[in-house]
Amino acid sequence: MTEKDQSVNNEEFAEKEDNTAKDSNTDEQIEKTASEDDVQNDSSAVDDKEKEIQQLKEEVNEQEEKYLRLYAEFENYKRRIQNENQTLKTYQAQCVLTDILPTIDNIERALQIEGEDESFKSLQKGVQMVYESLLRALEENGLEKIEAVGQQFDPNFHQAVMQDEDDSFESNAVTQELQTGYKLKDRVLRPSMVKVNQ
């Protein structure tokens, strides 16, 4: 090999080394750029995932709030229905009792009639027993008589139809009950018709 050939070989070798170094630098730059791109891509992917997670959390919270509102509404509905049912049970007999009151009045009037005949007294005793039995059954279903005579006049329970002047009663006291008043639990079915002292 001649000196010239060796010089060409050395130049070629140097050139190859230089190209290898350049290639190595280029590869490093490409890897560095790729690595930076990967980091940026990973960072933006993480940001996207975090946004998606946050959005999903908000949706879950929103659905949970809707559920809690619906649950509260349902509980209120159940309570309202229970109260309405209880009220219906309490006052279910109101219409029937209101219709029976005139019959009770008629029985009371019949019992006030006096007679001397034994058959009349026997009949009256039977009517009295039926009357007491009927009142007992009605009282067991919540019917109560409104107390009137001697009580202070109360427009919630009494209906004044006459005035009286009686020194044995206080002013504004009921002196006489003309028609018995009744209430069902705490609801007045019919006020007592009364005479009130001045």
From Swiss-Prot:
Cytoplasm as UniProt keyword: yes
Pfam families: GrpE (PF01025)
Region (Disordered): 1-58
Gene3D superfamilies: 3.90.20.20, Head domain of nucleotide exchange factor GrpE
Bias (Basic and acidic residues) ranges: 16-35, 46-58
Main subcellular localisation: cytoplasm
GO biological process: protein folding
Subcellular location: Cytoplasm
Record GO terms (molecular function): adenyl-nucleotide exchange factor activity; protein homodimerization activity; protein-folding chaperone binding; unfolded protein binding
Keywords per UniProt: Chaperone, Cytoplasm, Stress response
Cellular component GO terms, alphabetical: cytoplasm
Listed PROSITE patterns: GRPE (PS01071)
Keyword Ribonucleoprotein: no
Quaternary structure and partners: Homodimer.
Function in brief: Participates actively in the response to hyperosmotic and heat shock by preventing the aggregation of stress-denatured proteins, in association with DnaK and GrpE. It is the nucleotide exchange factor for DnaK and may function as a thermosensor. Unfolded proteins bind initially to DnaJ; upon interaction with the DnaJ-bound protein, DnaK hydrolyzes its bound ATP, resulting in the formation of a stable complex. GrpE releases ADP from DnaK; ATP binding to DnaK triggers the release of the substrate protein, thus completing the reaction cycle.
Family assignment from sequence similarity: Belongs to the GrpE family.
HAMAP family found in the cross-reference section: GrpE
Name of the protein in its database record: Protein GrpE
Organism of origin: Staphylococcus carnosus (strain TM300)
